[in-house]
């Protein structure tokens, strides 16, 4: 009976899990999704940093441009190192819902280490720079108003930056919340799936609306 119960799980694993030694197309899909996804998050942090340097620290364009090579190095090197680490650890697996190759779909440790933790760090760091920049702009706005000068242009800039912040931070926060929901409940889902008690109405099940929301974001 035990062997019969394991056969479906092994069959599912064969269809879901693809490691670095698997099809080359799976590896390419993983690199396209994971590498560029993480790179885009780092570029957002860099954009937030440069805006803080310009608005809060009064750096000029030339001073910021002098660090461009370091920004490019960070934006491309960090995702490269993480992608290589995933491939070296044979941690590429398949998403059973979306049907793409990614990391962390079969291992909570990989989900937390390679996906959830970096996204949280990037969102927190970028938001911190944006908040510091807004505080500096509000101070500048107060000083300008006290001098009797109009602040229309500055306020328009603040509105644009605010819209940009919302358009990124809200979807990023939703994606992180979906990953937290998944990593918090996945063990219970797997235990319920492996339990031979099909008539249990209270068996925990994943809410697929949460997964669809994550993919939409």
From Swiss-Prot:
Function of the molecule: Receptor for Wnt proteins. Most of frizzled receptors are coupled to the beta-catenin canonical signaling pathway, which leads to the activation of disheveled proteins, inhibition of GSK-3 kinase, nuclear accumulation of beta-catenin and activation of Wnt target genes. A second signaling pathway involving PKC and calcium fluxes has been seen for some family members, but it is not yet clear if it represents a distinct pathway or if it can be integrated in the canonical pathway, as PKC seems to be required for Wnt-mediated inactivation of GSK-3 kinase.
Similarity comment: family membership: Belongs to the G-protein coupled receptor Fz/Smo family.
Gene Ontology cellular component list: plasma membrane
Lineage: Eukaryota, Metazoa, Chordata, Craniata, Vertebrata
Protein name: Frizzled-8
Residues carrying sugar: 105, 194
Taxonomy, superkingdom: Eukaryota
GO molecular function, one term: G protein-coupled receptor activity
Keyword NAD found: no
Topology relative to the membrane: Multi-pass membrane protein
InterPro entries on file: Frizzled/SFRP, Frizzled/Smoothened_7TM, GPCR_2-like_7TM
Gene giving rise to this polypeptide: FZD8
Residue spans, topological domain Cytoplasmic: 48-69, 135-160
Localization per record: Membrane; Cell membrane
């Amino acid at each position: 009976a035990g062997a019969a119960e394991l056969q479906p799980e092994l069959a599912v694993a064969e269809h879901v899990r693809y490691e670095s030694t698997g099809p080359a197309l799976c590896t390419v899909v993983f690199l396209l999704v994971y590498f560029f996804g993480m790179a885009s998050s780092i570029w957002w942090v860099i954009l937030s940093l440069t805006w803080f340097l310009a608005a809060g620290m009064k750096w000029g364009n030339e001073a910021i441009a002098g660090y461009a090579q370091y920004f490019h190095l960070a934006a491309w090197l960090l995702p490269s190192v993480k992608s290589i680490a995933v491939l070296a650890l044979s941690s590429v697996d398949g998403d059973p819902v979306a049907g793409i190759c990614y990391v962390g779909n079969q291992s909570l440790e990989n989900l937390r280490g390679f996906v959830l933790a970096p996204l949280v760090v990037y969102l927190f760091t970028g938001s911190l720079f944006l908040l510091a920049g807004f505080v500096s702009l509000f101070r500048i706005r107060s000083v300008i108003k006290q001098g009797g000068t109009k602040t229309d242009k500055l306020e328009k800039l603040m509105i644009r930056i605010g819209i940009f912040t919302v358009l990124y931070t809200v979807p990023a926060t939703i994606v992180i919340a979906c990953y937290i929901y998944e990593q918090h409940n996945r063990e219970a889902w797997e235990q319920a799936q492996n339990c031979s008690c099909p008539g249990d109405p209270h068996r925990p099940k994943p809410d697929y609306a949460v997964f669809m929301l994550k993919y939409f974001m």
